[in-house]
Amino acid sequence: MNYTTQMDAAKKGIITKEMQVVAEKEGINIETLMNLMAEGKIVIPANKNHKSISAEGVGQGLKTKINVNLGISKDCANIELELEKVKKAIDMNAESIMDLSNYGKTYDFRKRLVEVSTAMIGTVPMYDVVGFYDKELKDITVDEFFDVVEKHAKDGVDFVTIHAGLNRETIETFRRNKRLTNIVSRGGSLLFAWMELNNRENPFYEYFDRLLDICEKYDLTLSLGDACRPGSIADATDAVQIKELITLGELTKRAWERNVQVIIEGPGHMAMNEIEANVLLEKKLCHGAPFYVLGPIVTDIAPGYDHITSAIGGAMAASYGADFLCYVTPAEHLRLPNLEDVREGIVATKIAAHAADIAKGISGARDIDNKMSDARKRLDWDEMFSLAIDSEKAIRYRKESTPEHKDSCTMCGKMCSIRNMNKILEGKDINLLRED
């Protein structure tokens, strides 16, 4: 190959096979795609060692993508169940899967995930350091942090979340500005603890070029994590969050100089009226890099329903320009999600992403809605089911409450507006009280 990374290829005017796949999926001119990749406004996460991937693009002018989180924990270490979730995510056309395993030797699951997943794969290496070395957090060395990142890269993951923006300056801002929920990022809180226990700078910030060496070697996309994302609507858009975002913008430019692709991670918990400003801030401060939002969750009072609170925030964020939505399941804040939670989270997030694509004017986004509306006008139930984002549920609901007349449902029966308009416009009687 005459290039090191997808970004390097784009800058050199080299069309990669991954670019060809993305251009075809998106219906975008490949030269336009390549130019936006060269500017860092679109990324194609595709590790050189992930052979089963069907490449996806994330960024400006492309369809909004969704990510599914899964992985083993100490309390739920069933690898086979997590692989069932992987299959469910792929079957439901999720573009990304993040393995957030944080217990034991995570290699076995990660290896199998890379073998079977056509979706791009992300990880948070910070979760793995304690289990990998079987050492307490405070005893982990700088070399060991980077060795784990390289291990994940070598295994074939396409992007890694690294909380490089949590430096000593950001921590000082955190200390000066009281928060209701402190630091809620799991990786961020672990890094904060390591820095405090060792009185050291964040190694991923201090030795950022070493991180870029790994990313360049494997064409590993860098997802710059927001350690200080708000964990409550009270903490949204505060000085700590913005301080870290400014740092992430500076690191983005350094990564681009090395042809390393970058995604910026964002909030978090946030009231609806703050979402548009946050998307604008990310795009300005991080120079148009793709924005990956974790929700946003728009109210803090809905445990058990946070797939809904996040779908509201995600639809808004993506409509304003966010590019990548992390799903949230009904189990958020309560437990590890089961298979049904995963399904519900995917459906809610896909609805949010699609609704945003319509609002953004993504080419062809409305086509399936128009097909659905036409099928409804014709009362073609089979076609409606085939077009539904969750066909299984639509079919089940229809079967659970069967109408007397096939050209209606049990909500309206013969008073169905579509049925009656069709008949009247065809010059027929609607016969509400007697048989047709």
From Swiss-Prot:
Zn(2+) binds at residues 269, 333. Its EC number is 4.1.99.17. Keywords: 4Fe-4S, Iron, Iron-sulfur, Lyase, Metal-binding, S-adenosyl-L-methionine, Thiamine biosynthesis, Zinc. Coiled coil: none annotated. GO terms for molecular function: 4 iron, 4 sulfur cluster binding; carbon-carbon lyase activity; zinc ion binding. Its cofactor is [4Fe-4S] cluster. Pathway: Cofactor biosynthesis; thiamine diphosphate biosynthesis. [4Fe-4S] cluster binds at residues 409, 412, 416. It is an enzyme of class 4 (lyase). It holds the Pfam family ThiC_Rad_SAM. Signal peptide: none annotated. Binds 1 [4Fe-4S] cluster per subunit. The cluster is coordinated with 3 cysteines and an exchangeable S-adenosyl-L-methionine. It catalyses: 5-amino-1-(5-phospho-beta-D-ribosyl)imidazole + S-adenosyl-L-methionine = 4-amino-2-methyl-5-(phosphooxymethyl)pyrimidine + CO + 5'-deoxyadenosine + formate + L-methionine + 3 H(+). It comes from the Bacteria. GO terms for cellular component: cytosol. Disulfide bonds: none annotated. Substrate binds at residues 69, 98, 127, 163, 185-187, 226-229, 265, 292. GO terms for biological process: thiamine biosynthetic process; thiamine diphosphate biosynthetic process. Gene3D superfamilies: 6.10.250.620, Radical SAM ThiC family, central domain. Catalyzes the synthesis of the hydroxymethylpyrimidine phosphate (HMP-P) moiety of thiamine from aminoimidazole ribotide (AIR) in a radical S-adenosyl-L-methionine (SAM)-dependent reaction. Belongs to the ThiC family. This is Phosphomethylpyrimidine synthase. It comes from Clostridium perfringens (strain SM101 / Type A).
